[in-house]
């Protein structure tokens, strides 16, 4: 699934004359490699060139959370004394047109532009959304499973099987969340990869 998505996005990049795609926090990173970056002040970024294998630039402290997928992406972990922006800039050598994820922290974008003032920077969303908006049969099946689970809970809620009286909004939310998990729903099935 991830390899197919990478291949499709590289084809789209070539058709849009984009040399490289940079993805950080947000929904794109899990969609393409199955990993959701922690919203830290340390840079985690997937560098996808229009050809070749992508590279995930990640802080050492976050490295243990990554599921290795060596046929899909390389991992470049950086330590406290290393400059991750320089690692990304080096990976972009020769790139002119670069698309960056909408949820990338501004400070990382500014630092990258300081090092590479001649790149033509654009938003990645026009490319990534083309892929993310069209669901495969597997994705549709997973969405249907998630919807069925939530429908069961909604039915219990409508029939008074979930206690609401005397509960705070937070308590009701926690109970609904607990029941969603009990029904087999999880972030991976629901949001992160679909």
State what each model feature region is.
Residues 19, 73, 96:
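Conserved acidic residues
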Residues 58-65, 103-108:
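Short, polar loop motifs at secondary-structure junctions
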Residues 64-71, 154:
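Short, basic/glycine-rich phosphate-binding loops at helix/coil junctions
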């Amino acid at each position: 699934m991830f390899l197919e998505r990478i291949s499709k996005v590289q084809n789209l990049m070539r058709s849009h004359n984009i040399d490289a795609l940079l993805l950080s926090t947000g929904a794109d990173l899990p969609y393409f490699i199955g990993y959701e970056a922690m919203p830290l002040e340390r840079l985690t970024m997937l560098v996808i060139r229009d050809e070749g294998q992508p590279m995930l630039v990640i802080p050492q402290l976050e490295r243990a959370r990554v599921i290795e997928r060596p046929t899909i992406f390389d991992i470049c972990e950086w330590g406290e004394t290393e400059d991750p922006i320089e690692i990304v800039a080096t990976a972009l050598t020769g790139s002119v047109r670069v698309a960056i994820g909408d949820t990338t922290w501004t400070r990382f974008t500014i630092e990258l532009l300081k090092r590479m003032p001649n790149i033509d920077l654009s938003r990645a969303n026009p490319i990534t959304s083309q892929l993310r908006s069209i669901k495969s049969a597997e994705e549709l099946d997973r969405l249907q499973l998630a919807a069925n689970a939530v429908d069961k809970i909604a039915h219990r809620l409508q029939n008074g099987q979930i206690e609401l009286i005397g509960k705070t909004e937070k308590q009701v939310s926690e109970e609904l969340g607990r029941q969603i998990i009990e029904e087999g729903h999880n972030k991976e099935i629901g949001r992160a990869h679909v």
